[in-house]
Amino acid sequence: LFAPMIDWVISAVKESGIDDICVVKGFGAEYLDAHLADSCKTVLQSERLGTGHAVLQAGSFIEKNGGDVLVLNGDAPFIDAKTIYDALALHRKEGNSVTVISAEIDDPTGYGRIIRSADGSVERIVEQRDASAEEAAVREVNSGAFWFEGEALMRALNALSEKRASGENTKKEFYLTDALEEIKSYGLRAGSFTAQSADIILGANDRVQLNELNELARRRELEKHMRAGVSIPCTDGVIICPGAKIGRDTVILTGSVIKGDSVIGEDCTIGPDSLVENSTIENGVSFVRSVCYSSNILSGADIGPFVRIRPGSVIGKSVHVGNFVEVKNSTIGADTKISHLSYIGDSDLGTGINIGCGCATANYSGNKKSRTTIKNGAFIGCHTCLVAPVEVGENAYTAAGMSPTTRSQSPAQDRRSKRAG
């Protein structure tokens, strides 16, 4: 849903109350650095020697922070804060040195099976290729997520690394499942927390699996909003990103996409076929077949169809912006009408203005951009080109086809009315 999988994982971790986060990077490390910036610490795994080796690269981070350590896969986006929190509670209650977060699934083919002892503790994790027929029938599988006691984890990982270096362990790689067995060999306890949702095990190794994750995430978000009072009569093509907030009794129609941290109020109609990105739309707005980027639309506005609102714009209360209008970096006052085929760029419009068909604010001279000001109650005739910097005074009008070019505090032309006699 327009966000890297790692963002979903980090969001769940932070929601669970964990602030100290370290990401182990490998292939494409430069892209990860650019994306994460300074939001969390990163360390590089220069050689791909397994998940155990990857976590060992964060050894100084683990030793510095101490205590219990959560290890997650960066490409398993459906881990959630409740699962993390509840697994930690079990980890501490049972006195485990390692607790694997598991899931029960109908078809465990390809996953490591959780083999438990008679007392309920984890005896080992058996991979598909090594499982006996009895073990292969086990439906509880390893999600790849673990809680570790930090000191036990580092002791195990260092031991596994030394065994690999000395040739005692002939395997090229070592894994977190190996760390579990190493910790068990110290006489310490291993446990398992079974998550409520099996979705936590899901990851993506190709575009088909990525599409499946996106569809599952999309359905989750839509159901969340529908349960909160948002109407989505037909969900085809509707995408709502996790950061979006939508008020009750708003209707989202087919083909609409709501991205980023957009906020939409109550009793709105969005769509069909609309895009709202990082924008705020207040109550009672109609937004039809239009796009809005990083802007604010105030209550009661009527937008569309085929309107493009570019960043930095504020559309006032009860404003009408009709078909084939573009607004860019402009403020439009309440009750103003821009009905069709116009461009309003780098402009400040007052209240109660009427913009005729085919009007434009010419904001670019070829080397700089300037602003246009239209004051309250002005009437801009069709095919007017306002060449910035220019000002149209209060209650003034321009005749059809005019091209005002001068800044004036006085009206461009006073309105006239017919009088008897």
Question: Across the structure, where does each feature detected by a protein language model lie?
Answer:
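Conserved core of the sugar-phosphate nucleotidyltransferase
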Residues: 19, 30, 34, 38, ...
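Conserved alpha/beta core of the MobA/IspD/sugar-nucleotide pyrophosphorylase nucleotidyltransferase superfamily
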Residues: 139-246
